[in-house]
Amino acid sequence: MSNSTVVVVTGVSSGIGRAAAEKFAKRGCRVFGTVRSIAKAAPLPGVELVEMDVRDDASVKTGIQSIIDRAKRIDVLVNNAGMSLTGAVEETATAEAASLFDTNVLSILRTAQAVLPHMRARRSGRIVNVSSVLGFLPAPYMGLYSASKHAVEGLTESLDHEVRQFGIRATLVEPSFTRTNLDINAPQASSKIADYDRERALASNAVVGSVKSAPEPGGVANAIVEAALGTWRMRRTPAGQASLLSKLRRFMPAGPVDASLRKSFGLG
């Protein structure tokens, strides 16, 4: 086990993080999965659970150090933990936006800052940040979530330029809708403005429908494992809708992309 690749995956209680942790374990890696509460987390075969709140500086430092103490190193960090938020931009309170960015963006800053000294000392490592197709596409009525994922994209690309001198690479995985509870149970902006009611409902129903018909997390988990262990590429979009959307964004004119996106959110 001492020669196995040591992988840390944040947010393994359910969904994509749990599926990714399982796949790393099956690949023979030594896997540490972080959860907010071990007492409330279901056991995960082949995965060592670590209690860590990615929104708390001290918790992240303690959690990462405990893994290093046990495994003596961290080869791969997968930043998967995240949350969603729906509602019009005008409806979203700054406190709600701050909480979202704390979880989706600043958590990556915390974990990266905790692992990078050790990776720099070893002159190797890989950081995989789970973004979204909404990191390169707009999303009506998911504006703040989309903004947080755009931030993840910029942070990751900049980080990669900074750390490659140390033999470390950062990379992105950009899934589309996946059949998890993240979007089905997404919190809504607490302040509702009646003028947005009709379109907000249409967009919300479209998202729920897309999630219910979306693939299970296994495909995204495969992309994460390849991003971590395979040849470095800046971004990976899982096969299917995510890959198609990436190609549309790159190769289609802006007008048709805009019209297609509005249609997919039920806005005509």
Where do the model's predicted regions map?
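Substrate-binding pocket helix/loop in short-chain dehydrogenase/reductase
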Residues: 88-89, 96-98
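Conserved glycine-rich cofactor-binding loop
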Residues: 13-14
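Rossmann-fold cofactor-recognition segment
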Residues: 45-58
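C-terminal beta-strand-loop-alpha-helix "lid" module of Rossmann-like NAD(P)-dependent dehydrogenases
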Residues: 162-211
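Active-site helix of classical SDR
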Residues: 112, 148
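A glycine-rich helix->loop->beta "capping" turn
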Residues: 66-79, 85
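Residue(s) in the substrate-gating loop at a strand-loop-helix junction
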Residues: 132
